Amino acid sequence: MNKNKILIIDDDVDLLASTKLFLKSKKFEVETAINSKIGLGTLKTFHPDLIILDIMMDTNLEGFNFLNELKSDDNFKETPIIMSTGMAKSIGVNMRAAIEDIDSLPKTKFIDKSGDWEELLEAIKELL
């Protein structure tokens, strides 16, 4: 049986490492990238079944810019995305509603960066 492949793109290296470790313990094949540029490079050799994407990294729109690149690539435009941020509450934006209402995105879920592993697993199961 093939493992499901997941690419995690996040500039929080501690969260990146702990999420990778958790998902590997659940038998996923995991690659990571600390920004969207590295993430796009990783897609040249790693073809994930799902991408976990931080929305706000070096810039507030970096995650959305990555999504635009992904949408224009026939190999990845249907890849499910779990989008996350730890900033939604602090900036007062309902990111979940904003993201899940964008029809042009592939299958997409939003989760808060809370370290809630069950919420993450539930989102993964729903999208795969």
Predicted regions and their residues:
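Acidic di-acidic motifs
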Residues: D10-D11, K113
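Two-component/phosphorelay signaling modules centered on CheY-like receiver
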Residues: V13-E31
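Active-site residues of response regulator receiver
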Residues: D54-I55
